Amino acid sequence: MITSYFNKIEEILQIVLQKEENLLKQAAEKVAESIQNGGIIQLFGCGHSHLLTEEVFYRAGGLVPIKPILVEPLMLHEGAVRSSKLERQNDYADWFLQDQDLQANDVLIVLSTSGRNPVPVDVAAYGKEKGAFVIGVTSLEYSKSQPSRHKSGKHLYNSVDLVINNHSVKGDAVLSYEKVQVPFAPTSTVVGATILNSMFAEAIKRMADNGYEPPIFLSGNIDGADDHNQLLIERYQKRIPLLALDGDEA
């Protein structure tokens, strides 16, 4: 099973590279343009998709102007089943979206593998309303196999400006075994992290080629990194209070 899972991940990553590379380059260009023009990159996901928003936040070797939109009831630690029920509610997003600082120079990345639930669709719509460029990371196979739960009938893939297909299968689980009735071994997190990090790597190259110094964190466990990182935090913490070193600085 270990080899089978590695093989499946490698297979899907190759499919993503072959089929999504041009779209990833378009997304990277938008990310680079946003940062060069004073914008930030905001990310949102519910449940396990939210893990990807934290994967790229305050990350050694990662971009500094990254802001995860963290809504605790939609995460897992306040109740896993509850978070799923809330994600399915139409208009649930209204209460937290009104507090979000989304601007026209920003890029908003919304992550949802099934792409069928109302909250990610509403977040994408709000981003477009605010003038941000909205990217969706989702599975087209999964989305098109299941009806939308949104009152408009829309999925995430037809609610955004640009779609990156993570090529997860319906249900996200890729392995089976004759003694197990339910498929297992999801792929969306591994592939999603690769999608985001490759997109940002390309954006960094493009900024550098444009003569703009990319704002990148050094690992805090390398001597001398704190001074480098603190200067970047001070540049962005007004728009990304989560970057503040302690609660008083937020």
UniProtKB/Swiss-Prot annotation:
Domain SIS per the UniProt entry, residue ranges: 31-214
InterPro entries, A to Z: RpiR-like_SIS (IPR035472), SIS_dom (IPR001347), SIS_dom_sf (IPR046348), SIS_GmhA/DiaA_subfam (IPR050099), UPF0309 (IPR022951)
GO BP: carbohydrate derivative metabolic process
Top-level taxonomic group: Bacteria
Any coiled-coil regions, as ranges: none
Gene Ontology MF terms in the entry: carbohydrate derivative binding
Similarity annotation: Belongs to the UPF0309 family.
PANTHER family: PHOSPHOHEPTOSE ISOMERASE (PTHR30390:SF7), SEDOHEPTULOSE 7-PHOSPHATE ISOMERASE / DNAA INITIATOR-ASSOCIATING FACTOR FOR REPLICATION INITIATION (PTHR30390)
Protein's name in the database: UPF0309 protein BH0227
Organism of origin: Halalkalibacterium halodurans (strain ATCC BAA-125 / DSM 18197 / FERM 7344 / JCM 9153 / C-125)
